[in-house]
């Protein structure tokens, strides 16, 4: 049995400020501050910072037993158990010193002692302020990350590291890129404060382990190769991949050999449990893949696993628990690289379908899509539904993935394979409402095979680069398919007040819906994704479910993901975090701006996965397929100017346009052609592709000099320059900017921390962070901000550079 990493017990927040600190491991920072602490109402940042410094001086005295006084003399604690501990000098002059020096030495010693007592008296009233801040309701994960990054004192850093255990997992997960970037590129004290939490969470969650391994590899890639090989980030990554952080209770768990009972819905368990020779013959998407059972190396590029793995008990051959998932992701990446070598879109599509058909031979397996947000096993990829997306030099592609939801990914058995020709003979099960189905009912609805923790048959356990996935969570719930005539009817259910709708209104709305059903796009060999993306998501789910051998199972779900090779998605991940933070700020400040952050999975420095935006197509595809202006397309899709559907879509357009205009201004988003702006079925616009932000622009052309993209077509949809909705748009811009600058620090710190040690083009230049802060205009009054918004709107609308860039994209890439 190998040495295991001992994690600290999770800390529990104290309910009373006067109680001892959570997770006080004896003689820590908080043992210095034992005074009564009242509820914090107002905190002066300067006072808090000063108090922090004072407290840390006491920490040094406690932990080091010796410190240096303001005069440079070493100090010693006499009673080092509280704030009132006495301090005496250690450099009292010995008796042998010359008599003429005695008086001077005594004076210095006396002055030092008096100075220490004076500082102690002056600071005693302030030393509890830092603790008050840390234990107040104001102290959230954002503030914790800020203190961890900005504090130079090991005591505060260690305390913040312990406090991470007190926050919700999802709150800390949002800042995982920042935590790992600090771990890689900052000093050892920060790394030592962060590591216990990372180790603890890796033991608890296989998905967290995977994401840490991928991000550690991606963010270490900016280091020099000689430094990278021996860096702390590489060592932690090897530790995670070695499976040393596997939950202790599962380390020596032998596979159960008892057969699982069969049910009437599925074939015998032999369907999934194949022999090694069968499994080897049926897989290999790459001809040179080697099975880990005979090759203990996890990756080609890693020289060896951490030395701790050598002591793992080898009484039975146990593959690393992350290896099947990493092999699954590696296979998807390899497909993308092979597609990029083909010349035409049609050839790429045919190759993609055949590659995914081979992939299905290894499913179901103990693999998952990390962006789903719920535990599940991947059972099938409907290969004929995959499409290659538009790209001039690369071959990103979109796939749909069928999964079976489960209660626990690690402990639930992998579902048995159902052959493609074994489509269900009855549809009674899928027609049942799913609202009342429990996890037990879901788990029992399909036959299983034993839970082989070392199941070689589950997936080929080969090595893989740094990889991972992201996708939208989709629950197809029959209880959600309820016709809703208006928002009023929903409100009436919540308020319990009766709302009467005239029969004529119902008939009118029904006729409007029938008259203006969404138009279907024609198939274009040069743009096959347009048809797939235009199809409503619920219709796609229903269609794929009907053709799937697993579709009759009540826990069946459909997910989707875009696979990208040759693109660095670390900037995309940074943009996602900023958008998510702005979305939270606007919700908190009750500003009705609308943006759609989509999930990003960084697999390596040149590959990743993206969550597709469902029910949305690009404005380029809209204009190319319909040959209409944007306003005419709105009228065609949603009805005439006075219909409820059009007015709702127009409002959605305005709220989303204002939100993304602010995002583009604050982040300086470039490459805003119509292929990178989507339009969804409800009228929202969604900006995608944040590869050029802050200090970078495409090919350094400098075409786009306006604050954001606001074309005449956009203004026409809003009702023109004199329309009420255009004024509403400018009002939302002002409200959104005012709200954002109130929380500027939350936005700026996301970017600032990721600049540490980074070689990303968005950070080129020394003034990136300063310019970002200046765009919040903290010194302006609201009247000045209103004038600024008017100027930006007018300048963007009249911008000749926007028109030039759109023309450039049309001539070079055919983007309308």
From Swiss-Prot:
Q: Where is this region: Activation loop?
A: 687-711
Phosphoserine is found on 258, 266, 275, 277, 284, 294, 428, 511
Keywords (alphabetical) are: Acetylation, ATP-binding, Endoplasmic reticulum, Golgi apparatus, Kinase, Lipid metabolism, Membrane, Mitochondrion, Mitochondrion outer membrane, Nucleotide-binding, Phosphoprotein, Transferase
Q: Which domain of life is it from?
A: Eukaryota
Q: Where is the composition biased (Polar residues)?
A: 278-297, 306-318
Q: Which GO terms describe its biological process?
A: phosphatidylinositol phosphate biosynthetic process; phosphatidylinositol-mediated signaling
Record-linked SMART domains: PI3Kc
| Chain intervals for the UniProt region annotation (G-loop) | 541-547
Q: Where in the cell is it found?
A: Endomembrane system; Mitochondrion outer membrane; Rough endoplasmic reticulum membrane; Golgi apparatus
Gene Ontology cellular component annotations, sorted alphabetically:
Golgi membrane; mitochondrial outer membrane; rough endoplasmic reticulum membrane
Does the UniProt entry include the keyword Lipid biosynthesis?
A: no
Relay the activity regulation note: Inhibited by wortmannin. Increased kinase activity upon interaction with NCS1/FREQ.
As cofactor, the record names: Mg(2+); Mn(2+)
Q: Which region ranges are annotated with the description Catalytic loop?
A: 668-676
Q: Which reaction does it catalyse?
A: a 1,2-diacyl-sn-glycero-3-phospho-(1D-myo-inositol) + ATP = a 1,2-diacyl-sn-glycero-3-phospho-(1D-myo-inositol 4-phosphate) + ADP + H(+)
Which positions bear Phosphothreonine? 263, 438, 517, 519
Q: How does it assemble?
A: Interacts with ARF1 and ARF3 in the Golgi complex, but not with ARF4, ARF5 or ARF6. Interacts with NCS1/FREQ in a calcium-independent manner. Interacts with CALN1/CABP8 and CALN2/CABP7; in a calcium-dependent manner; this interaction competes with NCS1/FREQ binding. Interacts with ACBD3. Interacts with ARMH3, YWHAB, YWHAE, YWHAG, YWHAH, YWHAQ, YWHAZ and SFN. Interacts with GGA2 (via VHS domain); the interaction is important for PI4KB location at the Golgi apparatus membrane. Interacts with ATG9A.
- Role description: Phosphorylates phosphatidylinositol (PI) in the first committed step in the production of the second messenger inositol-1,4,5,-trisphosphate (PIP). May regulate Golgi disintegration/reorganization during mitosis, possibly via its phosphorylation. Involved in Golgi-to-plasma membrane trafficking.
Can you say what this protein is called? Phosphatidylinositol 4-kinase beta
What is the gene name? PI4KB
């Amino acid at each position: 049995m190998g040495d295991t990493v001992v994690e600290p017990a999770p800390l529990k927040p104290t309910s009373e400020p006067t109680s001892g600190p959570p997770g006080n491991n004896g003689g820590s920072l908080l043992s210095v501050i034992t005074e009564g602490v009242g509820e914090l109402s107002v905190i002066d940042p300067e006072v808090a910072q000063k108090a922090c410094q004072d407290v840390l001086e006491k920490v040094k005295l406690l932990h080091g037993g010796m410190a240096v006084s303001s005069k440079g003399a070493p100090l010693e604690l006499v009673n080092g158990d509280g704030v009132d501990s006495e301090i005496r000098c250690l450099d009292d002059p010995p008796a042998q010193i010359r008599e003429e020096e005695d008086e001077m030495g005594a004076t210095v010693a006396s002055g030092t002692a008096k100075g220490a007592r004076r500082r102690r008296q002056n600071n005693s009233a302030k030393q509890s302020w830092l603790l008050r801040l840390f234990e107040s309701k104001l102290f959230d994960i954002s503030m914790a990350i800020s203190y961890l990054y900005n504090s130079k004192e090991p005591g505060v850093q260690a305390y913040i590291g312990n406090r991470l255990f007190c926050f919700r997992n999802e709150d800390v997960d949002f800042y995982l890129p920042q935590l790992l970037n600090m771990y890689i590129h900052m000093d050892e004290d920060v790394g030592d404060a962060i590591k216990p939490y990372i180790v603890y969470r890796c033991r608890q969650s296989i998905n967290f382990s995977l994401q840490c391994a991928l991000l550690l590899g991606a963010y270490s890639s900016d280091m020099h190769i000689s430094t990278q090989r021996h860096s702390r980030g590489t060592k932690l990554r090897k530790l995670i991949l070695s499976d040393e952080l596997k939950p202790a209770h599962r380390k020596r768990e032998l596979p159960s050999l008892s057969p699982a009972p069969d049910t009437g819905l599925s074939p015998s368990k032999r369907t999934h449990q194949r022999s090694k020779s069968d499994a080897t013959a049926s897989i290999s998407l790459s001809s040179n893949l080697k099975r880990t059972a005979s090759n203990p190396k996890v990756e080609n590029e890693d020289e060896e696993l951490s030395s701790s793995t050598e002591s793992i008990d080898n009484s039975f051959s146990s593959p690393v628990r992350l290896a099947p998932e990493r092999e699954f992701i590696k296979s998807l990446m390899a497909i993308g690289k092979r597609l990029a070598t083909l010349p035409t879109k049609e050839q790429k599509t045919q190759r993609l379908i055949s590659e995914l058909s081979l992939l299905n031979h290894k499913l179901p397996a103990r693999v998952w899509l990390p962006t789903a947000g719920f535990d599940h096993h991947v059972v099938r990829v409907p290969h004929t539904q995959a499409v290659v997306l538009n790209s001039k030099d690369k071959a990103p592609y979109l796939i749909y993935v069928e999964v079976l939801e489960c209660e626990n990914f690690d402990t639930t058995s992998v579902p048995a394979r159902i052959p493609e020709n074994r489509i269900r003979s009855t549809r009674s099960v899928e027609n049942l409402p799913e609202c009342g189905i429990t996890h037990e009912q879901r788990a029992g609805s399909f036959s299983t095979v034993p839970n082989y923790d070392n199941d070689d048959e589950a997936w080929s356990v080969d090595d893989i680069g740094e990889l991972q996935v992201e996708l939208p969570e989709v629950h197809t719930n029959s209880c959600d398919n309820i016709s809703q005539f208006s928002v009023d009817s929903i409100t009436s259910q919540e308020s319990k007040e009766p709302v009467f709708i005239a029969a004529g209104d119902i008939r009118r709305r029904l006729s409007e819906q029938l008259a203006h059903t969404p138009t279907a796009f024609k198939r274009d060999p040069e743009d096959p994704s347009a048809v797939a993306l235009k199809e409503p998501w619920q219709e796609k789910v229903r269609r794929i479910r009907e053709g799937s051998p697993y579709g009759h199972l009540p826990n069946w779900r459909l997910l989707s993901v875009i696979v990208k090779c040759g693109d660095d998605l670390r900037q995309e991940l940074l943009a996602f975090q900023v958008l998510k933070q702005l979305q939270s700020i606007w919700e908190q400040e009750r500003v009705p701006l609308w943006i759609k952050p989509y999930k990003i999975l960084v697999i390596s420095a040149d590959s990743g996965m993206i969550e597709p935006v469902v029910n949305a197509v690009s404005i380029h595809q809209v204009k190319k397929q319909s040959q209409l202006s944007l306003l005419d397309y709105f009228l065609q899709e949603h009805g005439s100017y006075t219909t409820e559907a059009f007015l709702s879509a127009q409002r959605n357009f305005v709220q989303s346009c204002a939100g993304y205009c602010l995002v583009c201004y604050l982040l300086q988003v470039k490459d805003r052609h119509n292929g990178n702006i989507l339009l969804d079925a409800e009228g929202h616009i969604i900006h995608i592709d944040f590869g050029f932000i802050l200090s970078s622009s495409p090919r350094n052309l400098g075409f786009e000099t306006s604050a954001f993209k606001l074309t005449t077509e956009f203004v026409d949809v809003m009702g023109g320059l004199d329309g009420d909705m255009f004024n509403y748009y400018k009002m939302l811009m002002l409200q959104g900017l005012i709200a954002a600058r109130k929380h500027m620090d939350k936005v700026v710190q996301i970017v600032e921390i990721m600049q540490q040690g980074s070689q990303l083009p968005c950070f080129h230049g020394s003034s990136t962070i300063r310019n970002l802060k200046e765009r919040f205009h903290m010194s302006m009054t609201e009247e000045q901000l209103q004038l600024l918004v008017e100027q930006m709107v007018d300048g963007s609308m009249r911008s000749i550079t926007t028109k030039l860039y759109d023309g450039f994209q049309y001539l070079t890439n055919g983007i309308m």
